[in-house]
Amino acid sequence: MNIAFFNDIRNEILNQISSAKEEINIAMAWFTNQDLLDALNSKLKENVMVNLIILDDEINRNDIYGLDFVSFINNGGNFYLSSISDKFLHHKFCIIDSKIIITGSYNWTNYAEYRNDENIIISDDQYVVLLYK
């Protein structure tokens, strides 16, 4: 399966998150979408391991756009901030159960969902998944 999505991306990601049984690994430059964080918190309560790394910048930390990741951590999520340096985290991918990769231009933000033209590709090609691990 190699499928590209240009519309209704958040719901496609939510569908993939809901299918996770063991582990979700996410590297995301910007993450401000509460629905996606809620889905990750739900998976943590089902004992799915969730690892999340995001960029340590103003968008992810401010009171207007930023999310409260304390609940994620309290539910057992592994949370990491990537510092801004000469080479900063600009990835946008998620690996589900080491079997499915979701990648593309879509940050997990409200802007990506409601204001930008974005895309993702969902693939179960194991060679591609391994490249991202």
Which positions does each model-derived feature cover?
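HKD-type phospholipase D/PLD-like phosphodiesterase module
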Residues: 1-19, 31-133
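Glycine-rich anion-binding loop/nest that anchors nucleotide
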Residues: 28
